[in-house]
Design a protein with these regions (language model features):
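A well-structured
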Residues: 2-130
C-alpha cells in the first residue's frame, strides 16, 4: 500500500472514532437542554457505554495500531500529520491502559453521576456522594 492510501485509511478510521465521540457529546448536550426525565438516565448511560465501547475497539484495533506505527516518525509526514500521530498515540495508549469492560463501566458511571450531581447541587445535599 502506498503512503497516501494508508493515510486515507487512517483518516477513515479517525472519522469513525470522531463520529462516536460527536454522537456521545451530542447525546449529553441534548439531554441537558431538554431536561431528560430522571428515569431515562439508565438507558442513556447504557447508550453512552455502548458508544464508548465502539470508540475503544477502534482505538485499540490492530490495523489502527499498525497504521499509527507506520506514520510515527515517517519521513513523508508533514507537520500536521506528525501532530495528529502524536495525539493518536497519546489517546490510544491512555485508553488501552484500561480494560474495555472497565472503561465502559466508567463511562456509564459518569453518565449517571452527572445527573445525580446536578440534583444534589440543586438541593444543596451532597450526601449521596459519600
Amino acid at each position: 500500500m502506498t503512503y497516501q492510501s494508508q493515510l486515507t485509511e487512517l483518516r477513515g478510521m479517525i472519522e469513525k472514532i470522531e463520529y462516536y465521540k460527536y454522537t456521545t457529546d451530542a447525546l449529553i448536550y441534548w439531554d441537558k437542554i431538554t431536561y431528560m426525565p430522571r428515569n431515562a438516565i439508565e438507558y442513556r448511560s447504557k447508550v453512552m457505554s455502548f458508544l464508548a465501547g465502539e470508540q475503544y475497539r477502534l482505538l485499540s484495533d490492530s490495523r489502527f495500531q499498525k497504521l499509527i506505527r507506520f506514520f510515527n516518525g515517517n519521513a513523508q509526514n508533514v507537520f500536521v500529520t506528525n501532530a495528529m500521530i502524536r495525539r493518536l498515540i497519546r489517546n490510544s495508549e491512555s485508553i488501552r491502559a484500561v480494560p474495555e469492560a472497565e472503561y465502559q463501566k466508567y463511562v456509564e458511571l459518569i453518565a449517571v453521576s452527572e445527573q445525580v450531581w446536578a440534583e444534589a447541587k440543586e438541593k444543596n445535599d451532597f450526601s449521596c456522594f459519600r
